[in-house]
Amino acid sequence: MTQEKKKFDAEVGKILNLMIHSLYSNKEIFMRELISNASDACDKLRYLSQSNNTLVAGDSNFKITVKIDKNNGQIIIRDNGIGMNKEDLIENLGTIARSGTANFLKNLSGDSKKDNMLIGQFGVGFYSSFMVADKVTVTSRKAGEDKVYVWESDGLGEYIVSNSGKEFTRGTAIVLNIKKEEDNFLDHFRLKHIVKSYSDHIAVPIYFFDENGNSEIQLNSASALWTRPKLEITEEQYKEFYKSLSYTIDDPWITLHNKNEGAIEFTNLLFIPSSKTFDLFHPDRKRRVKLYIKRVFISDENIDLIPSYLRFLRGVVDSEDLPLNISRESLQHNSILDKIKNAITKRVLAELKKKKEESPEDYNKFWSNFGGALKEGLCESTTDHEKLLEVCIFRSALHNKMISLDEYIANFKEGQNTIYYLSGDNPDKLLSSPQIEGLLSKNIDVLLFTDTVDDFWVNVNSEYKGHAIKSATRSDIDVEQTTSSSEEKNTDSKKSDDEYKLLTDYFKETLGDLVKDVKISKKLTSSPACLAVSESAMDIRMERFLIEQKQIANASAKNLELNPKNKIIEKIFNDLKANNKNNKELVNLIFDQACILEGEPVADTGAFSKRLNDIVQKAILSL
């Protein structure tokens, strides 16, 4: 027998160290993980055997067995699935092979209490064995191959891989040498109860040996949960199935179990989590819904089964219409799959709309977890944008609560036809923004957009049900004439511009290229000034984001809007009428203040500081 001793990857070492020293109370999840792995191994071979039935020759009935050897203090889990060769053992058990495990590592904090909680939130798979075992031995023979390999480790930094000359049929056997302090897992009644609780949804039959190690007792019905009538499935069974798919400890918020009959036949069992999924904004944006064809697992990767913005869904879809021998490549552009995707999307959005209307508090929690992902769909050309906008909610500046666009429209002021919003990073800062003070003073609501994606989708969706969606930073907003005709607005605007031409010209002359234009504001009520952009220009926050991402080089010059009713602006105007043009420092300070309020950089921080100090000094001396 040839042996190779290898060191675990550093990342695996971190996980093993945590498993060995774990204080996590729910250690029984190691059985959930090992049973799930065994089931996956059977599913993989079942799929491969569709195109190569010699892989299951002589042993086509898949099963998993669990056995306790009390004399040796061992638990043995055996399957006749796809098995592993030497390379598979090294890759799967010696390195980080799962994105879920990699994400587990990223979330480690060094705080033993917090890190132990993570064990229950992430699927750490095979490595969870070391919570209860001080030695693990894996014997495996890959389907279609003759050689048998053994992997063994005490979890302390190294493992041994060797070839075995012993007779061993296809599949994998895992032997756990149970720690003395965890010997309660060697109790037949307890382990049987644990296995049963984690196996009822597994489509592979699971057998448990009796206390004498002889006769096998089947613990599960071995029928896919989603194929059973809903009335025969308990809430606990749904919950356990969800947890086996999601590797989380939360319960599902919504369960959607439907059988679709007609032109396209499929069954879906989908769950919306009650807690935010750890990989929601991972760069690869993976979707976690498994595709089955006639109860045979096909894939859960690289298939367009649900839109990316619904990637928080967990569950399975089982199709009756797709051929079992379909290639992974053919799934990329498949008309049947497209119809299934459209039907699921429609069903999920309808359920979300129902929940939004019936359980607003619960929906708010859902939205805080997954609203950012949902709004990504508004940027996709294939989305039914209106249906998606119907389930979106936003913070209302006027009412300080989350409301839908339909609720906003229902509360329009008489004659109002526009939905106003303001985007930024912090809702509290947005509430104090001069951009919306005039609108709020007239009881015209403003929606507060605080997700980065908001700045993108509003560029694609400029209206909703015939109502324009407009940023409060636009120059053409007139709070006094919100409900007036465009002709009245133009007349009043021209009158104001003519009346204050002396003032606006002075600001333009003083600020030069720092501003695109200077106008009299129709939306400010108390603040002296604010930055604004024209109807065709990019929103201020969107531009700032693109600069940060190096998509554009420099910020564009903005309009500066002045409030002639403000005492400071009024003083400058009166001085100008008296031919006093000695307020240039004050003009620059007003502009700098407007930039700061919008999160824009001040052109010259040194000059800004000097101006501020000079004005404060003058104020003190005048006391």
Curated annotation (Swiss-Prot):
One GO CC term, this protein: cytoplasm
Chief localization: cytoplasm
Molecular function terms from GO: ATP binding; ATP hydrolysis activity; ATP-dependent protein folding chaperone; unfolded protein binding
Positions of the UniProt region annotated as B: 329-544
Stretch list, region A: 1-328
Subcellular compartments: Cytoplasm
UniProt KW Lipid metabolism keyword: no
A Pfam family the protein falls into: HATPase_c_3
UniProt keyword annotations, A-Z: ATP-binding, Chaperone, Cytoplasm, Nucleotide-binding, Stress response
Region named C: 545-623
Gene3D superfamilies per the UniProt record, alphabetical: 3.30.230.80, 3.40.50.11260, Heat shock protein 90, C-terminal domain (1.20.120.790), Histidine kinase-like ATPase, C-terminal domain (3.30.565.10)
General function of this protein: Molecular chaperone. Has ATPase activity.
Complex formation: Homodimer.
Record family assignment: Belongs to the heat shock protein 90 family.
UniProt protein name: Chaperone protein HtpG
Source organism of the structure: Rickettsia canadensis (strain McKiel)
Gene: htpG
